[in-house]
Curated annotation (Swiss-Prot):
Annotated GO CC locations: cytosolic large ribosomal subunit
Keywords linked to the UniProt accession: Ribonucleoprotein, Ribosomal protein
GO biological process terms held by the UniProt record: translation
Name of the featured protein: Large ribosomal subunit protein bL28
Cross-referenced Gene3D superfamilies: Ribosomal protein L28/L24
Alphabetized PANTHER family for the sequence: 39S RIBOSOMAL PROTEIN L28, MITOCHONDRIAL, LARGE RIBOSOMAL SUBUNIT PROTEIN BL28M
Family: Belongs to the bacterial ribosomal protein bL28 family.
Record GO terms (molecular function): structural constituent of ribosome
Annotated spans, Disordered: 1-24
Length: 78
């Protein structure tokens, strides 16, 4: 399963671990993703989304129905 938020589009980025002696080793910064079921009142069903913490806050603010319409406009299937 890909590490991409379905709401924000956040995905892993690369960077460095930096030790006290300034040695650098490559690493990945992965988004804080959770699989969550949301109740959609208009469709009378649950929708399962893989969202980041930021994506959950966006859903709380805008509402699940508006977020789903944005996802569907992008062409993603939900």
């Amino acid at each position: 399963m890909s590490q991409v938020c379905q709401v924000t589009g956040k995905r892993p980025v690369t960077g460095n671990n930096v030790s006290h002696s300034q040695r650098k080793t490559r690493r990945r910064f992965v988004p804080n993703l959770h699989t969550h079921r949301f109740w959609v009142e208009g469709e009378k069903r649950f929708v399962k989304l893989r969202v980041s913490s930021k994506g959950m806050r966006i859903i709380d603010k805008k509402g699940i129905e508006e977020v789903l319409s944005d996802i569907r406009k992008r062409g993603d299937r939900v």
